[in-house]
């Protein structure tokens, strides 16, 4: 589950979210230079943050998937209510795998106001979350060490590749 901590990270109330469980937090760099095109509904990771691109736009996050639109440009989807954006601060997002054909059908249904998005009311209990973090502190710390080692190894590899490039390619 991803917890939305901010909106508008890229454009159009794009969520800035992190996995609730710290052991599920990926750490990645952003592209440099950024892409000139990223399709609307693309899911990306930059640093430890997940974002959904609300419109076709440039982008620098590492791409990990596609999802339904988060921006209701034609105001056809009743689950948005009277807003053009779907997500709110502290909402949680949970993804599930579908085929490309299923995703295309969901997206077409969404565009035409027929998609029914599964929404569950839940409460984020901060005291329970702190207890979870305390209970899992050792495994979380072990994960963070491995995560940082992997990231450092990757950055070092990029530096070596960059240094090995002929000057005219830099």
Residue ranges of predicted features:
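Glycine-rich active-site loops that engage anionic ligands at enzyme catalytic sites
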Residues: 1-170
């Amino acid at each position: 589950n991803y917890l939305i901590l901010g909106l508008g990270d890229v454009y159009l109330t794009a969520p800035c979210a992190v996995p609730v469980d710290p052991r599920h937090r990926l750490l990645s760099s952003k592209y440099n230079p950024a892409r000139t095109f990223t399709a609307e509904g693309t899911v990306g990771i930059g640093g430890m943050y997940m974002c959904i691109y609300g419109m076709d736009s440039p982008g620098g996050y590492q791409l990990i998937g596609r999802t339904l639109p988060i921006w209701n440009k034609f105001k056809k989807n009743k689950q948005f209510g009277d807003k053009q954006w779907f997500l709110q601060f502290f909402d949680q997002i949970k993804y599930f795998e579908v085929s490309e054909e299923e995703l295309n059908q969901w997206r077409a249904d969404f565009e035409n106001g027929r998609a029914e998005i599964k929404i569950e009311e839940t409460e984020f209990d901060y005291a329970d979350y702190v207890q979870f973090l305390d209970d899992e502190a050792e495994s979380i710390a072990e994960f963070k060490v491995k995560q940082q080692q992997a990231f450092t190894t990757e950055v070092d590899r990029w530096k070596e590749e960059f240094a090995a490039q002929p000057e005219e390619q830099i």
